[in-house]
Amino acid sequence: MYAGDWLTRLTDLARDARNPRQWHVPSNVWGLGVTSMLTDVSSEMVLSILPAYLVMTGGLAPLALGVAAGVHEGGPMLAAWAGGLMADRSGRRKLTAGSGYALSAICRLGWFALSGRTITAIAGLVLVDRMGKALRTAPRDAIISLSVRPDQLATAFGVHRALDAAGAALGPILAFVLLWRMPGRYDVIFFASFVVAVLGVVALALLVEETPEPAAADADRIRLSSRDVFAAFGDAAVRPVLILATAFALVTISDAFVYLLLVQRSHAGAQWIPLLYTGTSVAFLALAVPVGYLADRIGGRGVFVFGHLLLLLAYAAAFGGLTVWPWNAVACVALLGGYYACSDGVLAGIASRVLPAATRAVGLAWVATGVSVGRLCSAIVFGVVWTRAGDRIAVTAFTTALVIVLCAAIATRSTGTAVAS
């Protein structure tokens, strides 16, 4: 983009920012944000302690942690398809999303019942919990996208992701406080997590309304078939978004590995790992809404690619020469928070712009599947390389691959072959 184009866009951005209408967000977005916030409080109370618990207490090798992290990220991808397809075929997106939230709440009760049992049983519950997340994600994002104007998509997703991040920040803090006051009482954390998850389901029922659709969307939904769903993969508008998202996902390092290596190389205690999750979520919370607003004004693709530049800098802070604790940790979590702000909600906004209303949940599921497959593969491969060749070679290989994908994304943008922003 030429400098004059950027100057024009920044001028328009400054003018639009003074318009209160640009910042109005519908109640559905707030309702889903509250639901996600409560659900993430519940989820992160448990999940934030698992990396250190599995490796240091459970004695798992890095390869096993890679498999666990990969399944956590990408294992439930079929559930995402089921959620998207059911939501688009029935038009009952709230009910479909609600079933995913309810499944996760049931898993919290399962964690309480299995307190003190085998790691395998707990890992199985993590998988089912992530299936609940996968089931609800596409219909939830479809509700958000259908509740706002097209020029508010990234802003709306930014508001939702900010509330989601607030929950992700509070969950580890609550777990830390409970263990500090009641050492070893993991059963208390599991039960408290279940109670908060139930409150999330109640919030969805009371605060979120089903999104109305135009008659054209109803007609398209009646004709929607499995063949149409898979044909969306070849859609000229959807495919570049899917390729871009999947390519970056394939070269990312799971947060579990980032935090684990960060504390090991800094000779810090494992008790800091939950607070690293919290720090990342706080940074995400602070940046999600303004970054979403910026993406709506200047285009989402550039913001998305810039987020992965921040990810590269986060890796430099975690794995590079800066080992002065806690400043390396502060830099790492701040940059990771910026990365998530530029990628998570922004990617959903990019995809929503090119997807028709009748198949939006399925289309978003396509993108989520690409990201899940990429993260599944990257986590397993990183674990394999670490186990067989050492963590330094694994980090070097993945950061080099990230640089290559970044250069390719910038090059395709400059030649005009990139996805529309």
Predicted feature locations:
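Juxtamembrane intracellular "pre-TM" segments in multi-pass secondary transporters
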Residues: 2-26, 210-244
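Helix-loop boundary and gating motifs at the non-cytosolic
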Residues: 16-74, 238-276
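Transmembrane alpha-helix termini and helix-breaking/packing motifs in multi-pass membrane transporters
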Residues: 52-57, 170-190, 377-393
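Helix-to-loop junctions at the C-terminal end of transmembrane segments
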Residues: 79-92, 179, 287-300, 386-387
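Cytoplasmic membrane-interface "Motif A"-like loop-to-helix N-cap segments
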Residues: 89-101, 297-309
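C-terminal ends and interior cores of transmembrane alpha-helices
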Residues: 102-117, 309-323
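Intracellular juxtamembrane helix-capping segments at the cytosolic ends
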Residues: 135-148, 342-355
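C-terminal membrane-cytosol helix-exit motif in multi-pass small-molecule transporters
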Residues: 195-216, 405-413
